[in-house]
Curated annotation (Swiss-Prot):
Residues 5-280 form the CN hydrolase domain. This is Nitrilase. The keyword Hydrolase applies. Keywords: Hydrolase. GO terms for molecular function: nitrilase activity. Signal peptide: none annotated. It catalyses: a nitrile + 2 H2O = a carboxylate + NH4(+). Disulfide bonds: none annotated. The active site is at E45 (proton acceptor), K127, C162 (nucleophile).
Length: 320
């Protein structure tokens, strides 16, 4: 395994409610990052087919027709569309953590697929608890989604979605899995001019949630976020709402294991890819001071119990 790598964090606008359009754009970004020499590429949350911000503004009844289209344009993990992306990853020879709305039977999940340089999905996980009104359209990830670190030729790569970064115990379990590079997948988060809007759902706070992972975990963090431009408000079903008046919402960044910002940020309404040349040995330098699952821990006094069992809706008597 090479210790010196180039990593990439995507900041881009989805192709709203357009499955094939989203696949094509995702492939184009993979190809672009690979041409720049990237080895590991991180994508925003539900980049395909975009984050459904309208669930924060409309009632379920008002939103139903749009969500029906959203369901149709979400991607199945085993599908021709995913096969196209896997083929592009294989051709590029990179490692990708892809964020998308996963359609499985009659339910949607906020998913991340970890795709290696052979085009193989080596890890697949779902957000364990959708945030607030997300629960109206997305299901919960089960115990298998607690495993969020993949051992790859480019190091041990992890991923979490959005406010999963606020889940203290989930972060701690990730650190116990010995993460090197963490992909922090986010939607667009808009600067607010609405006094009632919770401050902890702002770019400043959400960026801070990811920043903490770099320092606690002594790992590199690729914060990848969506943007939303004003001309696409209607497509995203948020036209005329106060909380999207300040368009953009991008806040992508790459952090070092010491918590340093390694790149200059893009403008909130700017599409692009952030790149950083990294050396995984930096992790061990940081851990000399701070290893919260090692020498700087007291498991005899404080420890974590993990249940990786996947709960199922149907059990058979002879399995009990």
């Amino acid at each position: 395994m090479s210790k010196s790598l180039k990593v990439a964090a995507i900041q881009a606008e989805p192709v709203w409610n357009d499955l094939q359009g989203g696949v094509n754009k995702s492939i184009g970004l993979i190809q672009e990052a690979a041409k720049e020499g990237a080895n590991v590429i991180g994508y925003p949350e539900v980049f395909i087919p975009g984050y459904p911000w309208s669930i924060w503004a409309n009632s379920p009844t008002e939103n139903a027709p749009w969500i029906n289209e959203y369901f149709k344009n979400s991607m199945e993990k085993e599908s021709p569309e995913m096969d196209q992306i896997r083929a592009a990853v294989r051709e590029a020879g990179v490692f990708v953590v892809l964020g998308y709305s996963e359609r499985y039977r009659g339910t949607l999940y906020i998913a991340q697929s970890f795709i290696d340089e052979t085009g193989t999905i080596v890890l697949h996980r779902r957000k364990i608890k959708p945030t607030h009104v997300e629960r109206a359209i997305y299901g919960d990830g089960q115990g298998e989604s607690l495993t969020n670190v993949a051992d790859t030729k480019f190091g041990r790569v992890a991923g979490l979605n959005c406010w999963e970064h606020t889940q203290t115990l989930l972060r701690y379990y990730e650190y116990x899995q010995d993460v090197d590079i963490h992909v922090s997948s986010w939607p667009s988060i808009f600067p607010q001019n609405v006094p009632e809007w919770p401050y902890h759902i702002t770019p400043e706070c959400c960026k801070a949630f990811s920043h903490v992972v770099s320092m606690e975990g002594a790992c590199f963090v690729l914060l990848a976020s969506q943007i939303m431009t004003e001309e696409n408000h209607k497509k995203a079903n948020v036209d005329g709402y106060d909380y999207t008046k300040k368009s953009g919402g991008g806040f992508s960044m790459i952090f070092s294991p010491f918590g340093e910002e390694l790149v200059k940020p893009l403008a909130p309404n700017e599409e692009g890819i952030l790149y950083a040349d990294i050396n995984l040995e930096e992790k061990y330098k940081a851990k000399q001071n701070l290893d919260i699952v090692g020498h700087y821990s007291r498991p005899d006094q404080l420890s974590l119990r993990v249940n990786k069992h996947a709960a199922k809706p149907v059990f058979f008597a002879n399995d009990l």
